[in-house]
Amino acid sequence: MRGFAAVLMGAALCFAHPCIAQMGPPDANPVPGMPGFAGPLAAKYGVDAAKILEAAETDEDGYAALTYLCDHVGKRLSGTPQLNTAVAWGAELMRKAGLQNVTVQPVMVPRWVRGSESAAMMYKGEAGPITRPLHMLGLGMSVGTPAGGITAPVVFVSTFDALDAMTPDEVKGKIVVFNPGWHGYGVNTQYRTFGASRVAAKGAVAMLVRSATGLAMQIPHTGTLVYDAKQPKIPAAAISVEDALMIERLCKEGPVTVHLQMDAHMDADVQAGNVMGEIVGSEHPEQVVSIGGHLDSWDVGQGAQDDGSGIMAAYEAVTLIHKLGLKPKRTIRLVFWVNEENGGAGGRAYRKMIGDKIGEQVAAIEMDEGAEKPLGMGYGSAGGPRRPRTPAAGAQSADASALSPQIQQSLAAMQDIVSLLGPIGANTVTPGGGGSDIEPLTADGVPALSPRTTGAHYFDWHHTEADTLDKVDPVEFRKNAAMLSVVTYVLADMDGRLAGRKSGGQ
């Protein structure tokens, strides 16, 4: 990377120093997903970007902090002592790094307790009845079963449409097992999130759902659910891909029964806190670029990719700027939000703290997709999905010309900025992006951004016992940090601002 940085620095010196009003070619009409083009921002910030890329190549502080977080704090579910340990540790980490105005914003978070849990299916075998344990994880915020568990016949359902076509008599008193296949996280999580109440409306006593992953390794993936207040709360759990497929096969042959036991329950809310530290702006300290991820995790694995890698890459991004002595005009605020996984209380509290000063929020950057090989940045205010997904066959790319002139100009500015990231292969920008923690900001018009990575394995480990430090490659981690650092610094220092749009508007 160092050689590329030197080339970039030399090329930058050949450019003039134009103003931000000329953010791209006069007829620029950015095409979503296309590589960036070098323009006035690349000319102005090429030297500083090269310094950041070179420093990031050898900086080990971020990965060292991630290692400590994973190995010495561990899983960090909201409401647990481990999360509050992480909050205190995170604040001290920022102080030692020399960030200013380090504070912990109090946030009340839910306390969901998993307790003991198990599941087994019973069906007819060649030599007699077979009882086979299921690989399961209760879904976050689920209620538990009655004492002794629930034993009930299974009804297999592939989709919500198939469920809607069933009569209540076909579902009442049964355990519904969903296996919609794998169509990407956004599709599959609809079943995990809303399936329990959908089947409860027809009288089901519990729900099991195929884990939201395309990888079959007998590993269940947890995640949160949301109950419909109008329906009874029934217990719900995720099962492995293999178990879901086997139940589907067996249900075609004859009766299948499942015994489900879950001690899950809610305790009283617990105080935690968003951790914040800043590089105060040299000219416009009241204007803020927020960058971060979520400090909490599920109660399985180490929360390494989700989202330890995100917060520590953001930490390294900000501290690189500080170490290099760069002085952005605006304030850069590093935020470790809490309770992203099962409530979103941290993001809402952060928005409430900002209050009527929302217009001073210049941009919000959230990293919550893992730290695999970086490809570039997503610009959520230009529309598109939060998470990148493969388009359907024959689908047409979004027409950038349909966007407002302000959004088009901002897309051009982002293409200009990401052109600085060519040395690490992260020089693309796509419409889409954002995150749960910054959604309360972006809903009120703050420009939303998030890293785009290959994401080749993220959902193999996501919300499982396998989300451990060894899944985070140190080289790719540093590239992500470098990408975030360059983008954050330019957004905090450039003369103009990206355009945002409120929810439902352009």
Could you say what each language-model-derived stretch is?
Residues A5-P18:
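Bacterial N-terminal signal peptides
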Residues G24-Y45, T67, D71-I175, G181-W182:
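Noncatalytic luminal/extracellular "stalk/propeptide" segments of secretory-pathway proteins
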Residues G39-T80, M217-T224, D296, D368-E372, ...:
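N-terminal capping segment at the start of a domain
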Residues G46-D48, K124-G125, M136-P168, L225-A304, ...:
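Soluble metallo-hydrolase cores and metallopeptidase-like ectodomains found primarily
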Residues A49-E57, D71-Q82, S118, M141, ...:
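Second-shell loop/turn segments in exported
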Residues A64, H72, T319-A345:
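Short helix-loop-beta-strand segments that form the rim/entrance of peptidase-like active sites
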Residues I234-I239, A244, C251, H284, ...:
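Metal-dependent peptidase/peptidase-like ectodomains
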Residues T319, K323, F459-Q506:
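His/Asp/Glu-rich mid-to-C-terminal helical/loop segments that flank catalytic regions of hydrolases
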